[in-house]
């Protein structure tokens, strides 16, 4: 079974390895590229913990994080924790249920002023009593020029993997622009919200 992976690198390769290990035949066609933004202008001295929800954030803010080694880092997901480990940065805790649950863990550890390093397209900032969260945008996912083989790759694959709502919206737009029938395209998404973003079809 062929699955089309459209997420940006290096995440696309990591996703492809997981699907290949599960017996699928991954086809890579990234429709986005990660762009690192300037490091946060805030001082880490005002925070008692840092939250990351993406390996992209870890890579984009490497210098900033290296200057903040005394501050515990909380990571959402094993991929984020792995990216931090690859950069030789310690992880205080790794969560698997999203940023709100992880903020709750940090709060239980006594941290009440958190800095969330995130991408431009991020979920809502959690609202937890007694916890103040500032967010710093350290990267963005920029749409690439539509590949010439877009329609052909979509047609030959059995399913398209969508990792984010933005990717779902962009993919649906490209399908419509290319005259592809949505009803003939199977989608595999990481949440109901992402599926809804892809629209009807």
PLM regions: where:
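Signature of uroporphyrinogen-III synthase
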Residues: 1-201
């Amino acid at each position: 079974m062929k699955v089309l992976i459209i997420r940006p690198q290096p995440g696309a390769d990591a996703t492809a390895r997981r699907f290949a290990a599960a017996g699928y035949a991954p086809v890579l066609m990234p429709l986005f590229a990660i762009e690192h933004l300037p490091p946060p202008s805030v001082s880490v001295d005002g925070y008692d913990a840092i939250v990351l929800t993406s390996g992209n954030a870890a890579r984009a803010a490497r210098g900033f994080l290296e200057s903040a080694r005394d501050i515990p880092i909380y990571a959402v997901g094993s991929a984020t924790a792995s990216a931090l480990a690859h950069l030789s940065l310690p992880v205080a805790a790794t969560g698997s249920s999203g940023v709100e649950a992880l903020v709750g863990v940090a709060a239980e550890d006594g941290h009440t002023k958190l800095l969330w390093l995130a991408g431009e397209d991020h979920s809502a900032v959690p609202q937890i009593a007694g916890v103040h969260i500032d967010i710093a945008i350290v990267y963005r996912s920029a749409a690439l020029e539509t590949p010439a083989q877009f329609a052909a790759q979509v047609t030959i694959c059995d399913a398209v993997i969508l990792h984010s709502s933005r990717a779902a919206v962009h993919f649906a737009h490209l399908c419509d622009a290319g005259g592809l029938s949505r009803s003939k395209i199977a989608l595999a998404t990481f949440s109901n919200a992402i599926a809804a973003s892809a629209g009807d079809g």
